[in-house]
């Protein structure tokens, strides 16, 4: 991080912005221009300074700057951000310290920054009241907009609003300027909105533009202005827009997939949905009506006669809807189909294509656009069961396959991909926030350093007084300003956080403490407590600490000293430090913090806190041996120091027993001091010092090393404390007089007698048992409330009323006693108490108002008592916290959502309200407004809310019918898209932020052991004690031998202790049981000799601790290591056994220092493995059995025993044989298959029935035989300890029982019949036999505990809504119906129950009946809520609720309209939150399990992973032999043409065009269009045939070696055949056009060529990766469906056909059952299937109805079985399957994105080999060195090396074989290494990869490299140098000789010649120097040598190489 320029913080940094400042800025700008006339913009953006993110406009001023001097508020100041130092800007700060940045240029060219008008405008603009005014205006405006027909006077109000907005804009424009400079009005996009709104307001006023209501909708945008006014919302909207960008790839993929599916749908179902059942033959009346008169001239024997003939008009007849067959109460005619498995018409009707499509004609596949809409609806799963049923009815049941594909691939996959992308985006955003926080922390530390330097002197001056202050509470506030300044800064934000928390938790939660009187008088005010201690709190960013730094190994062990502590429960804990002379390598200064080393987590650096970790124990209630221990100098002398860590991870060291152990403060475990084991001079090494520096703010040795340092530490601490107090006093929420008042009136401690009373009451009320009793009362009270039902007897009602009174009394008493015990002031300091008080008050108010009508709602508040359970139930607590957190965290998002809902509701009302009123007859037969309309704001809001719930299609049909298609589609689609983004974002954010692994795992150790656990613990101890006493008594009376007793005693002690500690996961330190470790990590022996004293800190230790820092500390070991809980103490037969097991314990203890569980032993966490396959059977019986019954012990050495043993071994071999297993699996499948035949028609098929009966017997015998064999082979012990065997055993038992019953003739008994249905479980046996399914099941079983926990919490949560529903609606859903028409009577005819009874007496057609799913009791309430939560069947429940009036009264249309809100609230909290919570839990769980069984990559660095993955891909590929180019010239030309990329791409374009022509087809196109399309199709067929022929010519027989080519060939052949035989094929097979659709798959090939499609490739890659896992889940789902289908057939085959059950969708046959179950897998339409099953008695059904062809009578259902069947199926399929689906996809998506982010991907290697093929046509795997340069240039990035690349290639040092050839892998390795960078760890991986390559390519020529490119170059260079040196030598010689002779001859010219000689030699030297540089360059570029691929032992091969060379020559 580059050093940020730090402005001196504090008030000195503010300067007024004056004319001089402006001049200075201008001067700087001029200087910069002079220096740098042409600024390079791009460069500046990349590397230049960036604006400081903390000083952005709109943010608050960082607190480091201190307070703004009052005279500077709202005045122009110089810019603080160094970035703007040479830009013309200034800032203004308002009272709230918000930063406003303005341009310093003249606004509107006339107003300079110093103009008084502009100054006033700025003051107004920055004032908080201004934004408040605007906010209020907007809200009022919104209220006016919701009026559907506003009165006339509102017109004037409109003008007022417009005026205010105009005023606002003018102020902004005057203050900021209009648009030219930065920070002017129009530079802010939010102001565009204002501008548009105002412009429109004036335009519509003065210009008449026609449709006013459409324009009025523009005013709605004003609501969006709220976003620009509230600061937090802008960022949220920004984030949403970002996530939309991220989603672009998924959107494209989704649209593409939908188009493909829509095309398939278009081809398959075009026109099918118009098939109707038309009456045929027509009746006489209809014949006459549809006859046309025709004048025909006929020739009678030559005479022409004119006749009128009546001809039947077929077309008009079939279009007449009167002759269509309608089911009663349905708007559309019944569909039918002409294939055998489609819907059939009743007698007297025939199936004809006529009339319009269903649902006003909007549901169809007739054109591409409607098909697309249908598919989109399928994907969003809205009312898709309707589409599914219509299509299957019209086309046939086989087409279920189409829906399965679309639902699984389209719906689940794509929608979850959107989820995955949003989750990733969110995760990245979080990461960014974290990094930013870390950076802030670092910057903050820098600033602190600066402050420290400035204030060092002041601090030293204050040191003397400071040490007094820490002892004298009254001396607060005498410090010098500067030092208080420092600490103010350093602790302010932490204080802010603490103050925020203080609202809730100010005092200690005194529950469960038995205190001595002197220990803590409540009367001491908090200030005095605070002054007794000192706290360090340094700014830490909340986010950083609370998030993900947990490791599974980090549970600290707390030691409970019950045996020797005077006060067991006082919790103390201690910091202690260890001198590091001996073990420098240790990880950091806290011995117990091994796994979260501060050095790793940047964010934690320099802040003194101990991180809270997952699984940490917070209660170390170690005994306190002495109260008056001596402390560090300057610490309070009243006792030990506590260190508490608050929820932000800030450590506070707090003095003495007067500490409030608040539930938030987390106590650190006791850390124990050993006498120093190091040399006493306390030397520290240099690395140690460095470590200290890096974590300077831990309480580390620095503080304790020498006295002066220590003194300073203390003084700093006290300075901090005092300032903290001042700060708190200055920040107290109320004026001081209130505090005085509360001290006098709210703290009651006037008389000592009262104090005694108080003390006694305190002892009673705070006792854990009282808490337990209260909890039991809460549960009972909840039960009482849940027992209300309708109709209730008087007596029962009375019991409930009395019960309520009693409970109210109990809770009131509890409250008053607590107030007495704690004083009102402290009582109301705690959240739970306030909550209790609120509820109690409400209950009392309710009792007072019991008889007032209409206040029954108050009763619902009693339900809140259920939440008191959260106090002692961690998961519920967590859920409430999560909901609380997320409501907080998502406050802004929720607000955005609310604004959006509001806007759309108003838009809908303005646009469509009028249409709904005018065209209502189109959608309602009685011309009354339907329930869902947009005529007023409330209904409009409900429609938008319903769309947000995902139910948009039905309301959209209505809207399209009344208001036109285009507008409705636009509005609804917008709501849908925004819904998906925002709602998904919302809930994902919620889940991800609230669900870090710690949340779930840390549930069991919340804050401290809660009172319930303490109470239960005591009960356990009591029971154990009583047991022991009885046992001892028995021993003494009956057993004389004292010896036995002696042995038993220690065991019981141990047992007893074990009970004590295991409940709390802690190991006890007993007199003879110290399971603690000393420094070396060994466990001390557990003899009686070792004493505990060693571990308890002696008083004198404190001093030695200070004077000699080289102390060692022993830390409690972690839970994982204490195997004491796991020792089976019952098995100890004697002392020696005990010793042995303790030794075992020692061995198994961890050897890691300071300890957490050893990483090396993952055995504890691995799944239970199947027993290994030994060839010897195991023992038959357990050892217990053998000891009891001696007869079970047989010697296997001789006689019968030996025969028995041999028999067992034979059986064992049989059972273990593969064939046996295969045979059994085959039998299981057959017997399961047999069950599918037992349907409604079995009685008519006698032969099949007989066969099945015999088969059943055979199967049963086989399975019994298998079971017996396994018993003999494995023995009972092994067989019955395996869960899968138990499953087999139980299923065999069921068959056996029913077989026996049949033989005895009891087959008709009810019990036996119901047993027979259990045969449906047979397929479960297949589970253990199929690996894939078993994996899924195991994963699920792992998730069950947490799923159950959440399920329970959800049930509690729903219970509240259910009881509330019972209170609101019980008995009010009854209504009087006309049984003939099914209509409800109007209120005018029937007002109440008695009226209805009178009607019934008069005629039989009326009936007083209830809605089937209602709120008459809590059970039905749950069912209703489930229907509401799944949005299936919720309409009827809601309508009934909204119409209800009172018990026994006839309902009236929308009487209690606002009951809708009950459902809205439930959907938000009950449905969205809880269901998403499930998804969260499941995903979280899978992640945890993955971590648990995590693969090898946990132990790899990121770099290694990248390299490893690259290599992994490498190893699997090998160069393919390309198709040889044909020798023939013509063929060769064609070959070149066909293999070019352009050819491929043009074919792709043709495919796409072909698709477009297919899209154009419609069902009712004219013959002309049909003929044109068929011609176009002909052209395409010709073109594709041409492609096929060309490829065949050029590729010859190689054409058929490529899969795609075969596919193309088949499609072409089919198309040609299809042209001629179209009629025939369509009649018998699928339309041939379908094959063309499959061609679209070829587009997948083109994706590789497009650079931009990387994202889409990643998504498809993720799909490919998820397929195996998804297949397993699918298999499991099929199994579940199969079992449920069988079960459904045996139970519901004969129910009455109504609502969702009809002739096609029923449980009569296996196929139909599967069709129904597939539909409810997505919970679609389950209410319809359940409704008929709820009929249990006449008149709803007829129990005596005869079913033809079967002996079963009646068509009644079994409600309890039905409800269980559907609810369990929905839970299993929804939770399990759908969520596992999500987990798998999220997982693979993240893997895929990681892969795509890697520097080298699969595609790069493919590209390498594709290019390779061109250079190595014969696939020799070698390439000549000359070609290498071209090859490297031909590759694409990142592997390519652009030319000139000779030197780089030489530098790569590639091994060459004879003929200067290089192997492809060597090249690829070298290039890969170049991309990934060098790393020393790669060699091992590399060898691995080479081995893998050798294995996969046995063809690899084993070759012997002779040399390498570098060596070759070096050889060449050496040769050249030698040559040149020799030549030079020769030249010199000749020159010398010549000159010598010459000299002889001509001495005169000698000098001249010498000069020449020198010149020549220089010239030569120059040449050789260039050669040298060449050489140095090539070696310089050379990274460490690249070894060969098959790297043999180098020396050996070099020798061999030389020999070969010699041979070669």
Swiss-Prot record:
The modification Phosphoserine is found at residues 470, 523, 525, 550-551, 607, 730, 1516. This is Sodium channel protein type 1 subunit alpha. Residues 370-384, 939-952, 1416-1433, 1712-1726 dip into the membrane without crossing it. One of its GO terms (molecular function) is voltage-gated sodium channel activity. It is a multi-pass membrane protein. Residues 1915-1944 form the IQ domain. III repeats lie at residues 1200-1514. One of its GO terms (biological process) is adult walking behavior. It is found in: Cell membrane. Residues 1-128, 178-188, 236-245, 424-768, 821-830, 875-891, 993-1218, 1277-1278, 1333-1345, 1484-1541, 1594-1601, 1656-1665, 1789-2009 are cytoplasmic. Pfam families: Ion_trans (PF00520), IQ_SCN5A_C (PF24609), Na_trans_assoc (PF06512), Na_trans_cytopl (PF11933). It comes from the Eukaryota. Residues 1619-1636 are annotated as: S3b-S4 loop of repeat IV. One of its GO terms (cellular component) is membrane. Glycans are attached at residues 211, 284, 295, 301, 306, 338, 1378, 1392, 1403. It comes from Rattus norvegicus. Belongs to the sodium channel (TC 1.A.1.10) family. Nav1.1/SCN1A subfamily. Phosphorylation at Ser-1516 by PKC in a highly conserved cytoplasmic loop slows inactivation of the sodium channel and reduces peak sodium currents. The sequence contains 4 internal repeats, each with 5 hydrophobic segments (S1, S2, S3, S5, S6) and one positively charged segment (S4). Segments S4 are probably the voltage-sensors and are characterized by a series of positively charged amino acids at every third position. InterPro entries: Ion_trans_dom, Na_channel_a1su, Na_channel_asu, Na_chnl_inactivation_gate, Na_trans_assoc_dom, Na_trans_cytopl, VGCC_Ca_Na, Volt_channel_dom_sf.
